[in-house]
A protein has these predicted regions:
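Conserved active-site regions of diverse hydrolases
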Residues: 2-210
């Protein structure tokens, strides 16, 4: 029950402010947030894993069968991801692109991207086992994003965009499913309560860095 309570709490904390924001704006008429920035796992990866050597990919059928154009973009979904729906509802953009997409436009950078990588987690060991982008590397990509944004819009406007951006972090289940319950190293080091506290501490550290 501990991991489930943690996930439910995270969803509750994220949903309340977003539900107010969605009620405060007519879709596609005005923006509450100038940009959206995403960190996490397969729940928020729009295709970053397409550009790294990992088995955790979703750029083939049946993924994307309900996506516009019926294209498998790398999203672990038959259609859009939650960040896409939020970005559209909040009037930011129709789709949140992958930061590693080489076709990323200046307009995409102005309105935000996702650094998420399917198979990742708060525990670096989780991402290492899956050969995907760990959270700390996602932070490095975020720093690179800031530099690119500053070159496009200037330092002052970049600060305004970043300060007003909606930031979403979605991860944690892989730390338990692909790590704690699947390989012995962490389960020998922690009991379930101890590992939950470890993951929560990693989340808190990540938020402080962001």
């Amino acid at each position: 029950m501990a991991p489930a309570n943690f996930i439910a709490l995270a969803v509750h904390m994220i949903w309340l402010p977003l539900s107010r924001a969605c009620n405060a704006v007519e879709p596609k008429t005005s923006r509450v947030f100038p940009a959206i920035l995403i960190f996490g796992d397969s729940t928020v990866d729009p295709g970053n894993n397409n550009y790294i050597p990992t088995l955790f990919k979703a750029n083939y059928n049946p993924y994307g069968r309900d996506f516009p154009g019926h294209i498998a973009t790398g999203r672990f979904s038959n259609g859009k991801l939650i960040p896409d729906i939020l970005a559209s509802t909040l009037g930011i953009k129709e789709l949140v692109p992958a930061f590693l997409d080489p076709m990323l436009s200046d307009g995409d950078l102005r309105t935000g991207v996702s650094f998420g990588s399917a198979g990742s987690g708060y525990d670096d060991l989780t991402a290492s086992r899956s050969r995907v982008i760990p959270m700390l590397k996602q932070i490095d990509l975020f720093k690179n994003y800031i530099q690119r944004l500053e070159r496009i819009v200037g330092e002052e406007k970049a600060k305004r965009i970043l300060n007003g951006a909606l930031v979403i972090v979605s991860a944690g289940s892989n730390d338990f499913i692909l790590n704690f319950y699947d390989i012995p190293s962490r389960s020998l080091e922690f009991n379930i309560s101890g590992y939950q506290a470890f993951v929560q501490n990693r989340l808190q550290s990540l938020i402080q860095v962001i």
